């Protein structure tokens, strides 16, 4: 790890910082670096995930014997607190939820999924809905929460999630168009449609 990644890892994992730039007179201008043994990397990754960090795994993507110059490396996997599936990084007997909240025009919907088990729950609210959303967040206690702009702008939801639950916050993309979202749901669950004559507004919030 290098630069700011190295500084963060050094602080959070009690690792010694070093540098290759010994020839640079000013220590502040040297590139900090640190690392861990490959065989024990999972232990260190688990500690970072437990502290709420995202971890990107990079590996060589070409044979060093045939590479010209520096061996190419690329990100092959990103692990986040809400997307962990490795049993060694999960607390035994405790759910590990990834949450999502969508708020728009007086309506809110929340979804929670434990990717390691496949458990999935959704709920939609109208009217005085913030208290209901906070109750659901407190009940499921997600490790990571994805929000749309409407949910983030309430301030109440991100503050509660971050300060009370200590979960990692992520902003969802701008594309919450209903038709596109419904198509994804139909493809995932092998449905012809998600139309309903009842609870139409709640359903649309949930789909988004």
Model-inferred region functions:
Residues 1-197, 201, 205:
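Basic, polar low-complexity surface loops/patches
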């Amino acid at each position: 790890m290098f630069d700011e990644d190295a500084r963060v890892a050094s602080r959070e994992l009690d690792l010694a910082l070093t540098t290759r730039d010994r020839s640079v007179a000013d220590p502040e201008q040297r590139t900090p670096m640190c690392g861990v043994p490959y065989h024990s990397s999972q232990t260190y990754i688990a500690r970072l995930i437990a502290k709420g960090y995202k971890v990107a795994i990079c590996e060589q993507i070409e044979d060093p014997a045939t590479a010209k110059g520096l061996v190419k490396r690329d990100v092959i996997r990103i692990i986040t607190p809400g997307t962990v599936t490795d049993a060694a990084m999960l607390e035994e007997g405790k759910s590990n939820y990834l949450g999502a909240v969508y708020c728009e025009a007086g309506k809110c919907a929340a979804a929670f999924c434990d990717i390691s088990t496949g458990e999935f729950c959704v709920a939609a609210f109208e009217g005085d809905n913030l208290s209901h959303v906070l109750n659901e967040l407190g009940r499921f206690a997600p490790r990571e929460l994805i929000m749309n702009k409407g949910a983030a702008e309430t301030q109440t939801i991100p503050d509660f999630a971050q300060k009370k639950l200590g979960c990692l916050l992520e902003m969802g993309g701008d594309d919450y168009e209903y038709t596109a979202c419904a198509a994804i749901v139909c493809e995932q669950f092998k449905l012809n449609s998600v139309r309903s004559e009842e609870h139409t507004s709640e359903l649309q919030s949930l789909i988004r």
